[in-house]
Amino acid sequence: LSGVESVSYGSDNPSSGNTWSSNFALGRGSEDAPVHTSLKFCDADYFKTYGLRLKAGRIFQPGDTLGELIVNETMLRKLGIHDANEVLGKPLRLGSQQWHEVVGVVEDFNSHSLHNELEPITMGSRKEFYNVVGLKIRPEQMAATTASIQQLFDATFPEQVFDGQFYDESIAEFYRDENRFALTCKGFALLAILISCLGLFGLASLMAVQK
């Protein structure tokens, strides 16, 4: 489809709020304290599709062994490292047996709402955890391309229901309750203003009668 700029596969989108988690320790010593981190799984095109920028190192490559990891800046700080290049090639230990090599550092991004603190995030490329297809669509072809994607999906998977969602819509869900509260507050404010106006009108009428 000409309207699609890039396609990626992943366990979820960057700000879905739905993540696995685990504990990783830096180095091979048993004395290294593990860091609790959220886990995301994605392919190499994930970073381009969602606009995630690398701080150091590289993204995943076809020849990787699936043991390579990319961490965010917050994870880097939790590991006690301040230079992004310093962690490249270092082993991260999962449990007591599994070793993984850090090949890249990605700039911090919000995986939840802006009310949540930035959290440590570790990213791997294991395909068995891919649940979501992400597509970056050219804005000027948005409507036509979206319709074509749904038609293609329905023709390929006739027994499945197309469940597509724009990225900004998924982010907006974080603030749905706040928007409802804001609308309620506006209603109360309007009511309060109206009551105040009625009160002023009544006072003015009373003063007019007294005169």
Segment roles from a protein language model:
Residues 198-211:
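Intracellular coupling helices
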Residues 2-177:
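Mid-to-C-terminal secondary-structure elements
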Residues 73, 166, 185-188, 198:
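Residue-level recognition of transmembrane alpha-helices
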